[in-house]
Curated annotation (Swiss-Prot):
Sequence positions that bind ATP 1: 129, 169, 175-176, 208, 210, 215, 241-243, 285, 299
Chain sites annotated for binding Mn(2+) 2: 299, 301
Reactions this protein catalyses: hydrogencarbonate + L-glutamine + 2 ATP + H2O = carbamoyl phosphate + L-glutamate + 2 ADP + phosphate + 2 H(+)
Cofactor(s) required, per the database record: Mg(2+); Mn(2+)
Residues the record lists as binding Mg(2+) 1: 285, 299
Protein name: Carbamoyl phosphate synthase large chain
Length: 1075
């Protein structure tokens, strides 16, 4: 049946900011849905608070709202735009929860809006654990023994029935948030208390433990005529007990017999029928007991999910696009498969002739004190996917694509260490982020496959594969480079060994292995992902490498090509913002007639969508892999400055190998990154910098620190996201940093900078084409200097800086761009103190603020800069004027502290945010209030506020206290702060710090006395002492600020109404044109 004609306009709900458990796979699905529905002639309205997404680009929908995904705000959008239907299955758990709330509040009924893609009843039946259990029993499928609890008493009663260990999961949360495994009553009570708090319905599901069972997922698509297809089966390499988002997964499933696969296939279709999903994709998760084969259904998601993004990339079947078309009434047999050029209908189940491996990427090093063991609560921040012809090839490609310093199965422990075996056994039994490497170490240390299986419950089939790779490594180490004859080397390359890994084993440089391959003429061929195992011809160039005979790449000979290197797996400090820039580069250069080639290995992103570029190579972004693609494609230019640190690290080596790197030269990049060379440029331009020094030994550091003066910012050179960066307050602190945080040497110097306390930090994005400099935007940070720029909220235009100061910055940016010979994007960070401008750093590449600035000003900076790199000047493009919008845009960050209970949520020079939201308003206050609502912070307009500030903030705190009083707050203060306020005639209630006797601050927070807390600290001792305030505020959901500037911004926003007015991006940009 063709599409519905009773619907003219559709509202798509996005997923909001990137958090652990809900990443950019929903930008990928949302962008596909927008395209698919507009193709069919529908008017598309989109709401998503995350500016770093492709789907919020003004050309993706007819009306785009970068507004909080909150039912009251969405109600305003519905009232204004009057859509006929709402599609909630593209924006993850956020969108589903929002849609259910709109239904509950009667908004959909009030404005006559139909829900498409899923019914409220189907969502509820899948998400409500009790209804789901009943539904499964009805169709004869088994579920885990479980019970539901809404209070601690109920929970304990369920535990008595289910027994220990048991698994606790809160309802309606994402990525297992708040859940865990309890082995005893004490752990059980702790997890339940947290879970009840985090579930929006205060509901817990308590299950019997399935730890050690095998876990599988089926990606299913079903239409209203009951056509049902399995897009892909996915097997978890790690057994149950580790969240599927944190498990290594493999597609298609490797260890099922055909009979078991058919049983699971039929069961998953039965689940969709029973739940009532009839227009879209779902994923169904199963567990199998390896001892007796008992099969149970764990859960199903009635929406597009993380796994469906993986399944789409693994098979080439665009699940989100198909689901969007099914939602408006099409059936599978009416839709054509794009990848085969319409030679097959969408009702054909994809078949694949390769193996796909996904490995999660973790960032525990950012969270001191976090529990880094893997459990049922998701903790990974990104993932990498690799494709190979065998399990071994695909696994080894994924390992090197992860960018954690491994080129394959690099050893984690030295076997000479007497503790080695103990450590290996511990790591296998209680999995952390690196377990896969410890498995290889276990085989090196002489454990048998059975021995490893007993510790890990990982299927023996997978273990045998790894054991074989370890034995081959031993052979390479034994024979050395002279023993690598053509046949042996080909065998190793077929099993996925990287040149760099073989070089390490043979004790030579990587270049020597490459030379050897050239001698043997041993190079990879490229195979296509075509959904049909090469049964039909394909027009889509979606490729992966493998060492076989026949190459299917067929590169064009007569076209100018530009290759864009992507950013690899998401991680903190390098996220979706960089992917956004890569996509824009590809789109702009395609429009200009170039053939574009994308190289990336992140399955969640839009850049790895088969129709974003002309040609897609799904490969690790490493020197070896990139050089092999260049060998075949011979591009005219390669762009390295858009994918963050990943491709930048390769710039010099690529240039040395004769690859045409376009844009800012690798040498110029080095001039900005290398401290000494940069210093020369700054001196020549006579710019001011905070006093600084570069040191290569601890005693030298102590001497230099005396000259510069404390406090100091200390960090290793060449880092992204502020890794191992700290503020130190005295010599003892400095010595501790050198002993614990870094290994310093001539090759790895450490930088010392005078820390400008209380300075205002500013970010400037600009583009230079060699003749002129375009200022993209000047952003004033809300948190003062010392908080990593990626963790600070910021405002465009600036909300306190004078015009003169901004002009000084404009001139300095221009001088720097010419001095460093920038071609393309650059980002400069300044600090302003006592009306003086200090230069902090320059990055001659795309910065993470580019998408935000583009949305705020309407200038697509990444596209403009890509054209500059390809040789088109700013004047030719007609983009020469800095745009200062007639409204305020505020970017606010989203932090993952709720996933890491042991971590202090104090902001500092290490970046820890996972995502961002944007708020727009006529005043700074309104924009800031919207950004707060978008980032889910719970701001109360009145109540009792607690003030506890450091020495340096005591002058300004009086002004803040007066503002809070005027707003109607009652005030509490700790001793030192209370004295200062008392002198100014404000008399707060005095409260005890934790070590001053009870009732103390923590008691009062627990009793719910506060609606707002401001706590600023300086100095290691004070930070340790006050950590309990910040953790308690987070745990009991009290809005808190850890900087005074944040406090002032918050008080300004208290009087603004974040839900009163909604403005689309298209309307915003029209206002700019008028002004």
């Amino acid at each position: 049946m063709p599409k519905r004609t009773d619907i003219k306009s559709i509202l798509i709900l996005g997923a909001g900011p990137i958090v652990i458990g809900q990443a950019c796979e929903f930008d990928y699905s949302g962008a596909q849905a927008c395209k698919a529905l507009r193709e069919e002639g529908y008017r598309v309205i989109l709401v998503n608070s995350n500016p770093a997404t492709i789907m919020t680009d003004p050309e993706m929908a007819d009306a785009t709202y970068i507004e909080p995904i909150h039912w009251e705000v969405v109600r305003k959008i519905i009232e204004k735009e009057r859509p006929d239907a709402v599609l909630p299955t593209m924006g993850g758990q956020t969108a589903l929860n929002c849609a259910l709330e709109l239904e509950r509040q009667g908004v959909l009924e009030e404005f006559g809006v139909t829900m498409i893609g899923a019914t409220a009843d189907a969502i509820d039946k899948a998400e409500d654990r009790r209804r789901f259990d009943i539904a499964m029993k009805k169709i004869g499928l088994d579920t885990a023994r479980s019970g539901i609890a809404h209070t601690m008493e109920e929970a304990l009663a369920v535990a008595a029935d289910v027994g220990f260990p048991c698994i606790i999961r809160p309802s309606f949360t994402m990525g297992g948030t708040g859940g865990g495994i309890a082995y005893n009553r004490e752990e059980f009570e702790e997890i339940c208390e947290r879970g009840l708090d985090l579930s929006p319905t205060n509901e817990l599901l308590i299950d019997e433990s399935l730890i050690g069972w095998k876990e599988y997922e089926m990606e299913v698509v079903r239409d209203k005529n009951d056509n049902c297809i399995i897009v892909c089966s996915i097997e978890n390499f790690d057994a149950m007990g580790i969240h599927t988002g944190d498990s290594i997964t493999v597609a298609p499933a490797q260890t099922l017999t055909d009979k078991e696969y058919q049983i699971m296939r039929n069961a998953s279709m039965a689940v969709l029928r029973e739940i009532g999903v009839e227009t879209g994709g779902s994923n169904v998760q199963f567990a199998v007991n390896p001892k007796n084969g008992r099969l149970i259904v764990i859960e199903m998601n009635p929406r597009v999910s993380r796994s469906s993004a993986l399944a789409s990339k693994a098979t080439g079947f665009p699940i989100a696009k198909v689901a969007a078309k099914l939602a408006v009434g099409y059936t599978l047999d009416e839709l054509m498969n794009d990848i085969t050029g319409g030679r097959t209908p969408a009702s054909f189940e994809p078949s694949i002739d390769y193996v796909v491996t996904k490995i999660p990427r973790f960032n525990f090093e950012k969270f001191a004190g976090a529990n880094d063991r893997l459990t049922t609560q998701m903790k990974s921040v990104g993932e990498v996917m690799a494709i190979g012809r065998t399990q071994q090839e695909s696994l080894q490609k994924a390992l090197r694509g992860l960018e954690v310093g491994a080129t394959g199965f690099d050893p984690k422990v030295s076997l000479d260490d007497p503790e080695a075996l103990t450590k290996i056994r511990r790591e296998l039994k209680d999995a952390g982020a690196d377990r896969i490497w410890y498995i290889a170490d276990a085989f090196r240390a002489g454990l048998s496959v059975d021995g490893v299986f007993n510790l890990t419950n990982i299927d023996r089939w997978f273990l045998v594969q790894i054991e074989e790779l370890v034995r081959l490594e031993e052979k390479v180490a034994e024979v050395g480079i002279t023993g690598l004859n053509a046949d042996f080397l080909r065998q190793l390359k077929r099993k996925g060994f990287a040149d760099a890994r073989l070089a390490k084993l043979a004790g030579v440089r990587e270049a020597e292995i490459r030379k050897l391959r050239d001698q043997y003429d041993l190079h990879p061929v490229y195979k296509r992902v075509d959904t049909c195992a090469a049964e039909f011809a394909t027009d889509t160039a979606y490729m992966y490498s493998t060492y076989e005979d026949e190459c299917e790449a067929n590169p064009s000979i007569d076209r100018d090509k530009i290759m864009v290197l992507g950013g690899g797996p998401n991680r903190i400090g390098q996220g979706i913002e960089f992917d956004y820039c890569c996509v824009h580069a590809s789109l702009a250069l395609r429009e200009d007639g170039y053939e574009t080639i994308m190289v990336n290995c992140n399955p969640e992103t839009v850049s790895t969508d088969y129709d974003t570029s002309d040609r897609l190579y799904f490969e690790p972004v490493t020197l070896e892999d990139v050089l092999e693609i260049v060998r075949i494609e011979k591009p005219k230019g390669v762009i390295v400055q858009y994918g963050g640190q990943t491709p930048l690290k390769l710039a010099r080596a690529l240039e040395a190998a004769g690859v045409p790197v376009i844009g800012t030269s690798p040498d110029a990049i080095d001039r900005a990154e290398d401290r000494e060379r940069f210093q020369h440029a700054v001196d020549r331009l006579k710019l001011k910098q905070p006093a600084n020094a570069t040191v290569t030994a601890i005693e030298q550091a102590v001497e230099k620190a005396k000259e510069i003066g404390y406090p100091l910012v200390v960090r290793p050179s060449y880092v992204l996201g502020g890794r191992a960066m700290e503020i130190v307050y005295d010599e003892a602190d400095l010595r501790r940093y050198f002993q614990t945080a870094v290994s310093v040497s001539n090759d790895a110097p450490v930088l010392l900078d005078r820390f400008l306390d209380d300075a205002v930090e500013v970010d400037v994005d600009a583009i230079c084409d060699g003749e002129m400099v375009l200022i993209g935007g000047i952003m004033e940070h809300i948190e003062q200097a010392g908080v990593h720029s990626g963790d600070s909220a910021c405002s465009l235009p600036a909300y306190t800086l004078s015009q003169e100061i901004q002009d000084v910055m404009r001139q300095q940016v221009q001088k720097l761009a010419f001095e460093l010979q920038v071609r393309g994007l650059m980002n400069v960070q300044f600090a302003v103190k006592d009306n003086e401008v200090y230069l902090i750093e320059v990055n001659p590449r795309a910065a993470r603020t580019v998408p935000f600035v583009s949305k705020a000003t309407g200038v697509p900076l990444a596209k403009v800069a890509a054209r500059v790199m390809a040789g088109k000047s700013l004047t030719e493009q007609g983009v020469t004027q800095e745009i200062i919008p007639p409204y305020y845009s505020v970017k606010e960050v989203v932090l993952p502290f709720n996933k890491f209970p042991g971590v202090d949520p104090l902001l500092g020079p290490e970046m820890r945010s996972t995502g961002e939201v944007m708020g727009v308003g006529r005043t700074f206050a309104e924009a800031f209030a919207k950004a707060q609502l978008g980032s889910n912070s719970t701001m109360k307009k009145q109540g009792r506020a607690l003030l506890s500030v450091r020495e340096g903030d005591k002058e300004r705190v009086v002004d803040l206290a007066a503002k809070l009083l005027k707003q109607g707050f009652e005030l509490d203060a700790t001793h030192g702060t209370a004295i200062v306020l008392g002198e100014a005639g404000i008399n707060p209630r005095l409260v005890n710090k934790v070590h001053e006797g009870r009732p103390h601050i923590q008691d009062r927070i627990k009793n719910g006395e506060y609606t707002y807390i401001i706590n600023t600290t300086a100095g290691r001792r004070a930070i340790e002492d006050s950590r309990v305030i910040r953790r308690s505020a987070l745990q009991y959901k009290v809005h808190y600020d850890t900087t005074l500037n944040g406090g002032f911004a918050t008080t300004m926003a208290l009087n603004a109404d974040a839900t009163e007015k909604v403005t689309s991006v298209q309307e915003m940009h029209a206002q700019i044109k008028k002004s």
